[in-house]
Amino acid sequence: MSDPRAVDPTARDIAEKLAPAYRTMLDAIAQVEPRIAEATRAELTDQRHSLKLIASENYASLPVLATMGTWFSDKYAEGTAGHRFYAGCQNVDTVETIAAEHACALFGAEHAYVQPHSGIDANLTAYWTILAHHIETPALSEFGARTVNDLTQVDWDTLRHRFNDQRAIGMSLDAGGHLTHGFRPNISGKMFDQRSYGTDPQTGLLDYDKVAELAREFKPLVIVAGYSAYPRRVNFAKMREIADEVGAVLMVDMAHFAGLVAGKVFTGDENPIPHAQVVTTTTHKSLRGPRGGMVLTTKDYADDVDRGCPMVLGGPLSHVMAAKAVALAEARTQTFRDYAQRVANNAKALAEGLMKRGVKLVTDGTDNHINLLDVTTSFGLTGRQAEAALLDAGVVTNRNSIPTDPNGAWYTSGIRIGTPALTSRGFGPDEFDQVAELIVTTLEATTPMTASTGKPGKAKYQIADGVAQKVHDAADELLGNFPLYPGLDLA
């Protein structure tokens, strides 16, 4: 296999061809609102000169970015391909069909719904797909109605009460779940009577026996599996066994690790597609596409999910669906599979680099793309302080709660870091070991400032003189060896 750190000549050729178009585009924007053109240029500069370690971020290819900037943005297309509420949607039908075909082929799914604008939209669509299939459709049959519009007011009130009487379980936020998995402040926590499962307090690992115990006791309609900050893989075959035992639907949110599924890093019991009836994902993150979402289902749920509009959504973002199709086509290549494997390998290298320097990691390592650092135990800092100090040094991360977090969900005790973005730039294990050194150097030089109570504060901090600039310079030198969008010169 060729050196993964070498610049792809095809990518450079594309960038050089697109550079004049981007320069012209920015000049045109500047004539209307120069501050937006300036911010766009500044964002590229910032991304080129920062160590992007946010696990949910990546770099989409220039063809994907270019696809979003077309007149597809102007077209309304409520409905699905061939069944629109607007005329003149034949080209949108083509785009949506191609994107869905790529999604099914890439993941081995029976059906794909590619309209959701985001991961949250995908999860909402999935929840209501399940409710429509298991609650609404049987009720319509019971009441002798074809659609909800045909119900009497009494029957409609009965159905609404049934909707509101359903149960779901998902991974708790501090254990690594997502806010859409039943977090009370989120709409998902208000839609369902909800309970959360966590992780083993000693190991930080998912305890399947505890999940099964909760499911038997609570008897949910939906069991949500998946995570946003859990640094290990999930056995979806076990989760399906639990769901089947209690008559629940298994819904998997693979937004964070979809790229590792697409790239064949997660296979067998770790691949959710053969085991879950409903799977949601974003199309960015590790999948490296545009910002958006998808729902993949078995054929039994196809008709229900295709009613995402008007059930949850309105008009799809046609220009983004087109970009999804391009990104999914890219993900079907061997180049992407090689990339996905490097993402996982690099995450292990980063974990080893951090642990050998004395950093405490939740679960003592990783086998996906995420590392979760306990910065309170390791450095006496809150996640908020560590996040801000690292940003001062040109290292972009996000604070994150850890299991039974003593600092709560706002200040947190952890930071979450991931390898997809820097792997896209060509970083390998040696570079990620250097990244570990830069992180530790920064945080060892950071101390909490005293609060008005006389105790160490949770927000303010100070970094030893010169350390932030030293780390920033070292990061910039490292990044210079792996240019972002090489050949894209906007000067």
UniProtKB/Swiss-Prot annotation:
Assembly description: Homodimer.
Protein name: Serine hydroxymethyltransferase
Residue(s) carrying N6-(pyridoxal phosphate)lysine: K285
Cofactor(s) in the UniProt record: pyridoxal 5'-phosphate
Site (Plays an important role in substrate specificity): H284
CDD domains membership: SHMT
GO molecular function, one term: glycine hydroxymethyltransferase activity
Gene3D superfamilies tied to this protein: Aspartate Aminotransferase, domain 1, Type I PLP-dependent aspartate aminotransferase-like (Major domain)
One cellular component (GO) term of this entry: cytosol
Family named by the database record: Belongs to the SHMT family.
EC annotation from Swiss-Prot or TrEMBL: 2.1.2.1
Catalytic reaction equation(s): (6R)-5,10-methylene-5,6,7,8-tetrahydrofolate + glycine + H2O = (6S)-5,6,7,8-tetrahydrofolate + L-serine
Residues that hold (6S)-5,6,7,8-tetrahydrofolate according to the record: L173, G177, H178, L179
Top enzyme category: transferase
PROSITE patterns (UniProt xref): SHMT
